[in-house]
Amino acid sequence: MAAAEAPRLAGMVVALQANFLEVELETFNPSSLVSWTGSTDDEPLRLLCTRRTRLDHRGAAVHVGDRVWVEAIDWQERRAVVGDVEPRQSWINRPPVANVTAVVVALAVKQPCFDADQASRFLLSAEQTGVDVHLILTKRDLITSDQLEQQLVRLRGWGYRPMAVSVQTGEGLGALKNKLSSTRLAVFCGPSGVGKTSLLNQLLPQLSLRVGAVSGRLKRGRHTTRHVELFRLCEGSLVADTPGFNRPELPADLRKLAVLFPELDGQLEDYPCRFRDCFHRDEPGCGVDKSWERYPIYKRFLEEMECLTRSSRGGSGSGLL
């Protein structure tokens, strides 16, 4: 029997399709299977899977990025059943992706123009995940070298090491691919229209992801990615394209806002405030230098969060996007 030829095998959920899961196997040796008639190259094998009802009974949801065990494998039809889910090492809510090791925030230098408020919202959402955050500036070819250097210096002041890329000229793509090759699962996020999908098409030429134009009236991109799917960048490294949103949510916890700003978090390590519940406005004993660029944004976000807290105790959950 086909199921008897293969034991339970480990894999990662790389896509969801209606009621099915697409699982990429970690290891696969086709030469050991009498019934195998497919390719024997080194490409990872993907199986279309259903899930055991016992997972539902245990309340074990299965999402993209989950490491799972598949069984009852039909090699000829490339189908199987997900029997178990491994504990997650990390989790982001929106979109739901498990075991992320890095978040890549993509922001355009132009078309649409760079917006510090919007950029900060995406960066705060990325910082909440607790994994490495990489900042990428797209459409580098639309501004001069001097303008780019000013933007890079500015973002270094925010506490990041930004990289600039252009899908038109190819500049920076090699360096970005090298950076991503050292992380197991990187999620791309950012406003729609900044070129995330175009960037992935350049990094992964075998893909043909649909690219949308930027809206002329709003100067915002039209969403082209409708679901989350993982793509293999190189051996041991996957990347995800995610649906774009123009206004991600702020974190729900007022007291965690400050540490999500790297330039403010660094100040608190060196010059802690007198009181633990300091919000770094006009409180006595505050050790924060308020001359940093994003301080007005921090105060604005804090006021917005306070209004939301007053209007709805508990608020809505925070997520990546």
Swiss-Prot record:
It holds the Pfam family RsgA_GTPase. GTP binds at residues 138-141, 190-198. One of its GO terms (biological process) is ribosomal small subunit biogenesis. InterPro entries: G_CP_dom, NA-bd_OB-fold, P-loop_NTPase, Ribosome_biogen_GTPase_RsgA, RsgA_GTPase_dom. Binds 1 zinc ion per subunit. GO terms for molecular function: GTP binding; GTPase activity; metal ion binding; rRNA binding. GO terms for cellular component: cytoplasm. Belongs to the TRAFAC class YlqF/YawG GTPase family. RsgA subfamily. This is Small ribosomal subunit biogenesis GTPase RsgA. It comes from Prochlorococcus marinus (strain MIT 9313).
